Amino acid sequence: MKITKYRTKKSLGQCFILDPAIAEKIVSYAGCLEQYNVIEVGPGLGIMTQSILNKEVRRLTAIEKDRRLSNIHSKLKEAHAEYDCIFEDILDVNIEQLLSQSPLKMISNLPYNISVILLLKLLPYIHRFEKLILMFQKEVADRIVAQPNTKSYSILSILVQLLCDVRKVEDFPPEIFSPSPKVYSSVIEITPLLSPRFSVDNSYFAQVLKKLFHCRRKTIRNSLKSCIKDADALFIGCNIDPNARAESLTIEQLCSLTNALKARNINII
């Protein structure tokens, strides 16, 4: 199937990699695949899919929303018994069932319009993967790997890095895609930890982060003054400057603050 015969859908965030050499380079970052079950989200025209299959993967499961691509993936399935393509919206898929077989790796050029939503959906199960090699819009990738005291440091940075080691592998120009997006893209290597870096109640942690980063230029004292009256003593007990802003706090400090707030049964509103 030629790209000229296929009309991409902007609503699906479709930006296809057409050069097999680029696809092979991205797949190479995942390392050996011979004994692995691999997940690919948004296989599109199957260029990356073929590169993964060339690595003698144990099992490759792709999830594709666009049923117009079924002919391509039916042919790949006929040629490779280890391949299967599920035509469904990944956001509607039972993630626990999808990730039931180990060991697991994930390699994907993620649709831009769902990349963050999908990553957050995967986080509760992220420990099941040995490694994820994912293509994001560069701005999103920068947020994932960002450190404190940087413009890109955000809730996304914190939630992902609490559970994983992250590394930006390479930036790619718009020209490698069809259609070409208006921005650069980046490949991120995500290596899940065996356990979180710090112990914290995930649901409560998310509430605290949302409160602190809602107005990121506010001091943490001002951000939490509606929730707790003697906040300064609590901050000092956590070795945190009450005049600091959320964007300057490390993940360890944020977890310590969250645990202290929870210990006092503070309702975050």
UniProtKB/Swiss-Prot annotation:
Major location, coarse class? cytoplasm
Report the GO terms under cellular component: cytoplasm
Superkingdom assignment = Bacteria
Annotated localization = Cytoplasm
Q: Which UniProt keywords apply?
A: Cytoplasm, Methyltransferase, RNA-binding, rRNA processing, S-adenosyl-L-methionine, Transferase
Query: Coiled-coil stretches, from where to where?
Result: none
What GO molecular functions are on record for this protein? 16S rRNA (adenine(1518)-N(6)/adenine(1519)-N(6))-dimethyltransferase activity; RNA binding
Enzyme Commission code(s) on record: 2.1.1.182
**InterPro entries, alphabetically?**
KsgA/Erm, rRNA_Ade_diMease-like_C, rRNA_Ade_Mease_Trfase_CS, rRNA_Ade_methylase_Trfase_N, rRNA_adenine_dimethylase, SAM-dependent_MTases_sf
- Chain residues that bind S-adenosyl-L-methionine: 17, 42, 64, 89, 109
EC main group? transferase
The record's catalysed reaction(s) read: adenosine(1518)/adenosine(1519) in 16S rRNA + 4 S-adenosyl-L-methionine = N(6)-dimethyladenosine(1518)/N(6)-dimethyladenosine(1519) in 16S rRNA + 4 S-adenosyl-L-homocysteine + 4 H(+)
Give the family this protein belongs to, as stated in its UniProt record: Belongs to the class I-like SAM-binding methyltransferase superfamily. rRNA adenine N(6)-methyltransferase family. RsmA subfamily.
Q: Which PANTHER family match?
A: DIMETHYLADENOSINE TRANSFERASE, DIMETHYLADENOSINE TRANSFERASE 1, MITOCHONDRIAL
Q: Which HAMAP family match?
A: 16SrRNA_methyltr_A (MF_00607)
Q: What does this protein do?
A: Specifically dimethylates two adjacent adenosines (A1518 and A1519) in the loop of a conserved hairpin near the 3'-end of 16S rRNA in the 30S particle. May play a critical role in biogenesis of 30S subunits.
User: Which NCBIfam families does the UniProt record give?
Assistant: ksgA
Provide the protein name: Ribosomal RNA small subunit methyltransferase A
